């Protein structure tokens, strides 16, 4: 004799049921351009801003909000290549393009799995993705291009902390651009 099966009290959530957001074309164009402008031009004047990676934060924001790996890759590639183009002659084209494409894919894939609206989750996501971003950037630069890059765990940890704190507030500001 078998016991009656207990009814499942949870819910099955399919990929289609997870809320994915859209953005106006103006937001899609202006938000990354402002982030890239700040990163490229204001960090030359305000050296302490150099620890922040605003384009990476924008890639993660759009990727987790859209929850589509293809759009995450495309967003990361475009923002990364624009960032590369403004990097100057000493910066090879494609390093940020590759890095931000990988981050865009990972963030959009993760956005389907977990709640990314929580500030604590956003903090952890940016902290981890900054470390991954730096690791991929170092791997591409050192491994493929044979650049003499220096790796410092303390610098990466402090940078990840600073980026995560700023990203929590930045994401709250960017939430205003979301459309269903």
Task: Please state what every model-predicted region is.
Residues 1-180:
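Terminal, non-globular segments
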